[in-house]
């Protein structure tokens, strides 16, 4: 399997339509898929330099720590970790657990800082407006019995701050393909 992303292609086509700029090529079953992927954030250092990227096309790339930019170049996928992010409400009487998987990317040269920057691929979902809730029976509770509780936000097509992010449904198909199977990824440029 080969995966690639053209970060210069638009992520946002307007009118709520997402651009397809992430490609999965599987030679064994002769298949090709093009899906959307989140856009890099970058940073606007007021009065110094503006490295921010918009939703249309990325124009700034980098591998510096804290840059929130995607580095173009070759990567190999590493280990997959799944971590507890917190609980969120799905109905008046039901909460759900957000467990989010993350595929670590490793690189050399222009992508050498990927591991130190925690650059990888993950579902485009997070919790916002997080507070701590006492839940002594949760296996995820901290030493004092508290767990994060917030509102689920799916940001497919949103900022990824240097990582590659996919809709939760696409991530559910892509991440298992990479798990325990080092895969080559190329991000253009």
Locate the predicted segments by residue.
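A conserved hydrophobic position in a structured secondary element of the catalytic/binding core
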Residues: 166
